[in-house]
Amino acid sequence: MSFNANLDTLYRQVIMDHYKNPRNKGVLNDSIVVDMNNPTCGDRIRLTMKLDGDIVEDAKFEGEGCSISMASASMMTQAIKGKDIETALSMSKIFSDMMQGKEYDDSIDLGDIEALQGVSKFPARIKCATLSWKALEKGVAKEEGGN
């Protein structure tokens, strides 16, 4: 078995682990609430976040969807907790670039999120992977706009 095949297998295992055992599943009370959906495949997510100044104090999600969208939400909420908003948004940009097959800044450790790299080869699934990240961006914009 080649190195790439082993890596693909590992990445699939990481994705399935986050799908079957999602981190941060649930709802936060008194928080920023963002509902997003992907009409193409039916994925739905509700992201709830609490900020302490410019720090993402906590983030949880609930929803229904394919393994990629739910695993991505699990990975994202895990990755952004404790990060400042600027870093969280930078991670979102990096993830978006990765999904589009663009060169991306690898100076920020994405952790398990890198397991989703292979999704970029399947254009129909990119929206699944980026749904929770779009919710993050919308939530930050909502908070900064005071809505």
Curated annotation (Swiss-Prot):
Presence of keyword Metal-binding: yes
Cofactor annotation: Zn(2+)
Cellular component GO terms held in the UniProt record: cytoplasm
UniProt cross-references to InterPro entries, sorted A to Z: NIF_FeS_clus_asmbl_NifU_N
Bound cofactor: record note: Bind 1 Zn(2+) per monomer.
EC number(s) recorded for this UniProt protein: 2.-.-.-
Knocked-out gene: effects: Essential, it cannot be deleted. Upon depletion cells grow very slowly while aconitase and succinate dehydrogenase, both of which contain Fe-S clusters, have decreased activity. Upon depletion no change in reactive oxygen species is observed, while a modified bacillibactin (BB), an endogenous siderophore, is produced.
Keywords carried by this UniProt record: Metal-binding, Transferase, Zinc
One example GO MF annotation: ferrous iron binding
Gene3D superfamilies (UniProt xref): 3.90.1010.10
Top-level taxon of origin: Bacteria
Function: Part of the SUF-like system that mediates the biosynthesis of iron-sulfur (Fe-S) clusters. Acts as a sulfurtransferase and thus transfers sulfur from SufS to SufB. Mechanistically, the transfer from SufS to SufU is triggered by zinc-ligand swapping that provides a free thiol from SufU to accept sulfur from SufS.
NCBIfam families: SUF_scaf_2
Descriptive protein name: Zinc-dependent sulfurtransferase SufU
Source species taxonomy: Bacteria, Bacillati, Bacillota, Bacilli, Bacillales
